[in-house]
Structures are given as structure tokens and as C-alpha cells.
Amino acid sequence: MRYAAAEKLEIIRLVEQSSISVRRTLAQLGIPRSTFYCWYDRYRSHDPEGLEDRTPAPRRVWNKLPAAVTQAVLGLALKEPELSPRELAVSFVDQQRYFVSEASVYRLLKAHDLITSPAFILLKAADHFAQPTTAPNQLWQTDFTYLRVIGWGWFYLSTVLDDFSRYILAWKLCTTMTATDVSDTLAMALRNSGLERVRVRHRPRLLSDNGPSYVSAQLGSWLVQHGMTHTRGKPYHPMTQGKIERYHRSMKNQILLENYYLPGQLEQRLAEFVDYYNSRRYHESLNNLPPADVYFGRAQTILTRRQKIKLKTIELRRRLHHQTAASTSTQMGQILS
């Protein structure tokens, strides 16, 4: 069977990302090892262009999406128009247990004129601290941002975010920006994380900017009492806290679509967004997982399940392609006989 260059590249990516051995992965895909390593050597030497064949590519694509899957993807896109092609692809795999790639979803949506420009342009923030975290609760980022309630004025949202997983541990809508507001939010984070109830060798390190509430002696004393160390970002360089800065922009892109006339209305909308962000929003930097799955240690189980779905789907499409090709060949033989 002849494969197009794009199909070869997809198989190479699949083998590279597989959680099982190369031999077992290729066996499940029905690809001889000698064939795969020939492709791989050409790919490493000449990039994707090296996978092109000199002879014309086959007319029939073996892993084309079935019509029923195409309609299901379009239905999900119409049901949840706020999702990007990447988020739609991951959501479809998790919900339907059938693999579709981001590229396939993008081409499908584009063909049906369902690709739209974002309502807001997000400025890029630095995503990595100088000393990257390797597990939850090693480093917490915290910051304030402003939100307005009509007839009441400005309120200040204090948030604590886990650096490793981006999980929102705690938030508080405040009328001031004092050290007490900060320590109250941190106390909620300690309770929500469970660290308040257990003895741990190292408490999370806190990362903040140099605002008055963060450099105060009152907060410093509170942190010492609770066994936490404190790192402050470089002055006039807010991108040190890239993850919480990005969270604030994502949150405001949704929250500011509505007007609020009572603080309680704003708090309710914030609670809804935090729940969505933590539990249902796929993050590309987290291998397309929501923060809660990473924070609570479910990541590897989900990624392994997705990999199995991908292998099973590709094998199913390959079998269907062979069946279709065999049926077509039989029909042609009957016509010519």
C-alpha cells in the first residue's frame, strides 16, 4: 500500500508520541519496521519534503474521515462555536472516543466557512519562569486585576494560580488591595489544596509583583508563619508572571462581554468561569488537558487513553480503506468480465 507524504508524517508523529514500544506501535498500525525506518531516515535528512514520492500520490486517502464523523464534528462545532479547531479536536476525542486531528478539524471548518477571527487579540506573555516547576504546589503565582460593577465602582480580583498546572486554587473579589486581602486569598488556597491539613517538607513558593500589598511587612510575617517563601518579579517587568497575566486576559475576554450591576452578579460569573477554566478548558501547553486533570494527577491516564483511541481509530480507517478498495476491485472485475 502506498502512503502520501502527509500520511507518512502522521505515522512518524504517532510513533514518536506513543507510550508503547516502536515495534508494538508499528505492529498495531500494520507498518513494517524496515519501511518505517526508511521513512524516518528520509525525514531526518530532508525534513517533511523527504517523505514525498517520485510517483503520483494515490487518489484515495486511506484515513479520510467517514461521512458520519464529519457530520458529528460539524455538529459539535455548531453546538460550541467558541472552541478553536484544536479544542474541538480534543473535545471530540474525549467525548466520542474517536480520533480526529486538529488539522482535519481546521480543514473541515474552513470548507464550511466556520472559521472566524477571535473577538479579542491576546498579547503573548512569557510562559516559563526562570526555574521551571516539575510538579503541583511548588510555585504559586498571585496578582490583582481590576473589574468594574456599574453604580458601585472598581473591584479588585485577587487570584492564586498553581504554576505547574495553571489550576486556579483560590480567588477573592475585594474592595481594597491590602496585605490582608492577599493573605486571605492565600489562606483559601492552602485550604483548597489540602496543604493546610498535612505536614509537608516544603510549602509552595509565592511569586508576585512588587505592589505595595506584596512587599508589606504584614504579608512577609504571614508567609513566615505559614512556612512559605516569597519571590518577587523583576520591577517594571510584569511578564515574569506570564501565566497569571495570561489567565487574567482570558478571563476578561469572557467576563467583560457582560455588564454587572451588583457585586454578587460579578462573583457568580467569576465562579462559573473559574469552574470552566479549571475543569473544561483545554490548554495546549498542558498537552491539551484542563488544569484540574494536571493538578490532581490524572494527566497520564487521560493521555494514555487518547493514544489508544488514536491507534484504534487509525487501524479502523485503514481496514475500511482496504475493504472499500477490495470491493471496488471486485466490481471492476465483474464489469470487465
Which sequence ranges carry the predicted segments?
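C-terminal domain-tail junction helix/linker
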Residues: 2, 224-228, 249-337
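Mobile-element integrase/transposase regions
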Residues: 68-69, 98-99, 107-161, 167, ...
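RNase H-like polynucleotidyl transferase catalytic core
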Residues: 203-210, 224-243, 257-263
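Acidic/histidine-rich, metal-coordinating catalytic segments
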Residues: 186, 197-216, 234-236, 287-292
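Residue-level signal for the short linker/turn that defines the boundary of a DNA-recognition helix
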Residues: 19-21, 83, 100, 261
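Basic, flexible linker segments flanking DNA-binding modules
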Residues: 41-139, 237-238, 295-302
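Residue-centric detector for conserved, function-critical "anchor" positions
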Residues: 1-79, 228-229
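Short hydrophobic alpha-helix segments
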Residues: 171-172
